[in-house]
């Protein structure tokens, strides 16, 4: 009987560990999935993908840094003792981040145009929106137990 319970315990343990692994992925796995999706949806050739995605992920990293600074500042707003002046600083930081992101988008559009046609860039950006929506749906879907 002990062997049965041990077997059952380890089986459940293995299944739960395996389930946790399938619900999350590393940043590199996520990037690879995103790259594959965008390339397929935008009908990029291997050559186009090889030139485009290093630029694309460079921009994503820069935007992540800009947004990280804004969200770090926003944590102050969780404190009930936050003053109006501090909230104003937080809001200004969000606006500053948006402006910085727009400037980066404009700068990187020129880099994109050096390797892709405008139509392909448009297709990538549309695919990116779809990808992000799909990811939100996955995240918001209640996990079955």
Model features per residue range: what roles?
Residues 1-25:
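Bacterial Sec-dependent N-terminal signal peptides
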Residues 2, 68-74, 127-133:
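N-terminal hydrophobic signal/anchor transmembrane helix of membrane proteins
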Residues 21-39:
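Short N-terminal segments immediately surrounding and downstream of signal-peptide cleavage
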Residues 25, 46, 82, 121-124:
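Soluble, non-transmembrane alpha-helical interaction regions
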Residues 34, 38-115:
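Amphipathic alpha-helical segments
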Residues 43, 58, 102, 106-145:
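Amphipathic, charged alpha-helical segments and their helix-to-coil junctions
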